[in-house]
């Protein structure tokens, strides 16, 4: 039965968006595809897969029998996503640009573009669900816990979710692959893209070095002993083990080194040994004002919080402050990282989230006081 509703699918050239488009066409929707160009290829020494992905998108849309258009949002991406990505790194943060890309590009630039050309809905291959049974659309986890992407969509409003379709949210990745194989889609065996979209196959630090250069400082142990030098705090994140470059220090060979603190004033990088070191754990965190999927006026909320993609959610208490919120975890969490997002859940219901401003840790505060490092406690 033909459905008169027009749906525009974001086609990336991967298996997920391919199956998304196929399922909607099979359901009778009037389906068209749009390939989004969000990144410019002009940056030096950077390998980009846009041309290959577009060729795959064209081929799979031909197979499915839907038209494919191109839309160039690279200017929006540069101004609203990438510039902030670089400035956050310069401030010693560890940003997650994919979250901002969803908010600013896929559910702003792309959504506006599609509505302007007559779409009733947009659709993407994200593994999430939307519940439209109430007065406002709710964002729910996808049923496949290994692929759930609600963490990345927590800044999308209920108003915009109501205009969005996510058919893969009810499927596992294995089922999606099988649908692609059963229909002989050319993307059925294509590997999933991993990591940040614009970095592609490039090494993370090599990529950002093209834009940020070097800002060297010293590497210290927790007592303040100098162990080496680094090229810039922006190349490290809290809890990081690989790439510190401290192998073979005499008398300290027994355990791996982990990043425990980045001091932006002195440019010192403090590292500790052992993944269970107290300086790596936090009792909670401070976040900016929460971006709620739907309006929430509670000053306190018992919830679950997820502090990185695919990490286990932890029970927590969210408390409103004069400037943002405080989150207290039910148990200490490893590598709570400023710049990353703390996303708030009630079961499968994703309520919203915010960027982590700072950690809450009595062990860290005592150590910082002894070392003379500044930190902020919000009230």
Please report, for each region that a protein language model flagged, where it lies by residue.
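AMP-forming adenylation/ATP pyrophosphatase catalytic core
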Residues: 12, 41, 123-379
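ATP-dependent adenylation/nucleotidyltransferase module used to activate substrates
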Residues: 1-154, 165, 174, 259, ...
């Amino acid at each position: 039965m033909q459905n008169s509703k027009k749906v525009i699918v974001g086609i990336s050239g991967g298996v997920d968006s391919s199956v998304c488009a196929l399922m909607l066409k099979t359901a009778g929707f009037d389906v068209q595809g749009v390939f989004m160009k969000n990144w410019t290829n002009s940056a030096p020494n950077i390998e980009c897969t846009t041309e290959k992905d577009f060729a795959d998108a064209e081929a799979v849309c031909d197979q499915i029998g839907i038209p494919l258009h191109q839309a160039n949002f690279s200017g929006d991406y540069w101004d609203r996503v990438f510039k902030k990505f670089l400035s956050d790194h310069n401030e010693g943060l560890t940003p997650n640009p994919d979250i901002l890309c969803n908010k600013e590009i896929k559910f702003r630039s792309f959504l506006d573009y599609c509505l302007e050309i007559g779409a009733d809905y947009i659709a993407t291959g994200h593994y999430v669900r939307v519940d439209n049974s109430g007065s406002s659309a709710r964002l729910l986890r996808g049923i496949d816990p290994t692929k759930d992407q609600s963490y990345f969509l927590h800044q999308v409003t209920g108003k915009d979710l109501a205009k969005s379709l996510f058919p893969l949210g009810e499927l596992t990745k294995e089922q999606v692959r099988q649908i692609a194989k059963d229909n002989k889609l050319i993307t059925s065996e294509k590997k999933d893209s991993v990591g940040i979209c614009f970095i592609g196959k490039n090494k993370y630090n090599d990529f950002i070095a093209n834009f940020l250069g070097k800002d060297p400082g010293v590497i210290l142990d927790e007592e303040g002993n100098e162990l080496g030098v680094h090229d810039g705090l922006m190349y490290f994140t809290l809890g990081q083990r690989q790439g510190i470059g401290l192998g073979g220090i005499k008398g300290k060979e027994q355990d791996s080194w982990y990043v425990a603190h980045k001091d932006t004033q002195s440019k010192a990088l403090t590292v500790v040994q052992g993944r269970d070191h107290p300086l790596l754990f936090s009792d909670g965190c401070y976040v900016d004002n929460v971006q709620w999927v739907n309006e929430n006026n509670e000053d306190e909320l018992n919830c679950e919080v997820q502090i990185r993609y695919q990490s286990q959610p932890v029970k927590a208490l969210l408390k409103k402050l004069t400037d943002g919120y405080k989150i207290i975890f039910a148990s200490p969490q490893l590598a709570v990282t400023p710049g990353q997002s703390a996303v708030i859940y009630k079961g499968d219901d994703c309520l919203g989230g915010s960027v982590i401003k700072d950690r809450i840790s009595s062990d860290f505060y005592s150590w910082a006081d002894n070392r003379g490092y500044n930190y902020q406690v919000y009230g």
